[in-house]
Amino acid sequence: MGTAPAYSLDGGRSLHRWLRDMREHHPVHRELLTRVWTLYRYRDITQATADPAVFSSELWRYLPGDRGDDALTAGNLTAMDPPRHRLVRDLVSRSFTARAVGALRPRIAAIAAELIGAVADRGEMDVVADLSDPLPVLVIGELLGLPMADRELLSDWARRLLSFDKGDLTDEVVRKRVADTQQELLDYLRVHCRRRRTNPQDDLISRLIRAEVDGQRLTEDEVVNFANLLLLAGHVTTTLLLANIVLTLDEHPAVAAEARADRGLIPGLIEETLRYRPVIVSNMRVTTRAVTVGTEQLPAGQLVSLSFISGNRDEQYFTDPDRFDIHRDARKHLGFGHGIHYCLGAPLARLELGIALDAMFDRFSRIEVTGVPVDYYDTPGVAGPRSLRIAFRHH
């Protein structure tokens, strides 16, 4: 069995071989060193996400010595269980509507065109640094109503929070730096939230402050932490997923040519990449009581890792799962999670990705990855390139 090979080793190739073996022989497995249980099969993962009463996202409630800081967890939908999760999600959904997201289309297109235009004469670019990193920060910053002058600051915070590696988590200095960076961002968002409370505008933060369901509103901590979640999760997902798409198309030139010729295939291309090369690798839960999964008995108070990257390649659920097929119905993938914690920002990410791909296909007649070997993040829970150099030709 051994230890899981790092994704960063070879872009997940060795890891996927290892995961296939785990699904077959050890689908529910407890790691001796970390004592964390991992679920590797699609069915077990989705049954866990569908049962938040047993598989809780409020890790701090059930783990001895874990600090439940309301100021940090309030409004963080990913760390919340029903019934509060339902209320907060309803309140957020009133403001973060499909209409609000759709209204961003012209701005996303303009931002993507501007970013691509800035590098078009070079004949080469870093997909991450030049396009997929700044795009979501600019879009989400605009959605939240944050000052244009602060965009580089926001991007820097997001990059710093993504850039620590797995091994760094044991380093107290690194952990403090991560915590300090997170606090800086929260403090910044709190100042902006208080400004909007006294001077509301037509932006998401103002709408979150005003949102009401059954006479209940979001607290200040909840507004601040949701803005933080949207900024960080929205940034990471779109940044790495666009890079993952470009990388995957480079490996499958016939698919790239097909999608370029028929732009109606782009939505299917995005969904299949979310399955084939997801950004969010796993998610944690904690058991609230003893539960049987497969043939294993998990006691109460156990940390459980849901291996989305493994579930997305489960042979029992997806036909020929190691084949990249943009014509398959991949919508049941776990790339945006599953159950009550399915990504609220998924429509925005899909819109950004579709527009960015369209813009790249329109501007460039040929795109080729040149930065080999690719430098991957080794950050826990996410998978994607730290940078991705490409060369291109104009139409």
Curated annotation (Swiss-Prot):
Cite the EC number: 1.14.-.-
Top EC group: oxidoreductase
MF GO annotations: heme binding; iron ion binding; monooxygenase activity; oxidoreductase activity, acting on paired donors, with incorporation or reduction of molecular oxygen
Alphabetized, the UniProt keywords read: Heme, Iron, Metal-binding, Monooxygenase, Oxidoreductase
Q: Which residues form the signal peptide?
A: none
KO phenotype (gene knockout): Abolishes the production of epoxide cyclomarin A, leading to the accumulation of the olefinic cyclomarin C.
- Segments forming a coiled coil: none
The answer, when asked if Oxidoreductase is one of the entry's keywords, is yes
Q: Which Pfam families match?
A: p450 (PF00067)
Q: Does the keyword Iron apply?
A: yes
Q: Which domain of life is it from?
A: Bacteria
Family, as annotated: Belongs to the cytochrome P450 family.
Role, per record: Cytochrome P450; part of the gene cluster that mediates the biosynthesis of cyclic heptapeptides, known as cyclomarins and also of cyclic dipeptides, called cyclomarazines, which have both antimicrobial and cytotoxic effects. First, CymD catalyzes the reverse N-prenylation of monomeric L-tryptophan with dimethylallyl diphosphate (DMAPP) to form N-(1,1-dimethylallyl)-tryptophan (r-N-DMAT).
Instruction: Output the PANTHER family linked to this UniProt entry.
Output: P450, PUTATIVE (EUROFUNG)-RELATED, PULCHERRIMINIC ACID SYNTHASE
Name used for this protein in its record: Cyclomarin C epoxidase CymV
